[in-house]
Amino acid sequence: AHMVPVEFWEWAIKAVKEKYPDVKFIAELYDVSIYRDYIYRGGFDYLYDKVNLYDRLRGIMCSNVSAAQITQCWQTVDGIGNHMLNFLENHDEQRIASREFAGNAQLAIPALVVSATLSTGPMMVYAGQELGEKAEDAEGFSGLDGRTTIFDYWSVPSLRRWMNGGKCNNELLSDEEVRLRDTYKKVLNAAKNEPAISRGQFFDVMYVNYNNPTLDPHRQYAYLRKDGDEVIVIVANFGAEANCQIAIPQHAFDILHLEKGTYVATEIISGKRQKKTLSPDAPFQTAVAANSAAMWKIKLTRQNASPKKKSSIKGGRDK
């Protein structure tokens, strides 16, 4: 789409949608300065956010880009985030688990969480990504390049084992592949089914945590998603295991209409339930495993809040 003038798309997309209104148009662009033109004038429903979010996340996974740059990513597409198609793999890019990229599919988990939950836009998962496809074959035209071919008569090994002769089950998968797929399933279902993610507000809390000794802004990234009476505190960890004490500013409470208190929270990926304090006066505490993420869902209701302790002062009055 990038090499075709936007005037053509303005005409073509409108003409197609007059007859087929449900058709979605996705553009592959490599210049963020023309994103808005191709959305508002050209009429594209979604844009591959390759040169913005994908490139940054790849760099973070490979430890040569700071996680703090994620803030710049959402700021670049502020107001059009719902039109961004986020992804970590596609037919052009190298597989995350390949030797040419990260060499380990687990390293994708924090990037997966960010890519799937940073905005209300869609997330694309490519064939076998959720199984940690390693692209170890040298397939004719493509050769051994960290990609799975789309040019040759070939099949993707991990997907072939998942298909299992039409059974579509875990019988031929390794334990590692099963665990990875389960994590993808939980994150993607949360992105689809949790209103705070699929349609909610976003608040980046990194600006008050850059000097936080419990959080490394180069390897961890924290933010909030909020809808109605539910808030999700998300921490993506691209580094070693961390015990983070995250500052949440009063501004977040004002903008998102949060009510401070101690609540029973559910961690979406693990299913664990713990009491968590949500307050501008005390840090939000969470442990995050290495190369993983924590997604704490809190229902902001009085029934969920811990009861306040009764005062020990009885019968007092001002004089």
List where the protein language model places each region:
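Alpha-amylase-like alpha-glycosidases and glucanotransferases acting on alpha-linked glucans and related
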Residues: 1-122, 127, 131, 137-138, ...
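Flexible, glycine-rich phosphate/dinucleotide-binding loops
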Residues: 32-34, 242, 272-274
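C-terminal beta-strand-rich structural cap/linker in extracellular carbohydrate-active enzymes
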Residues: 276-315
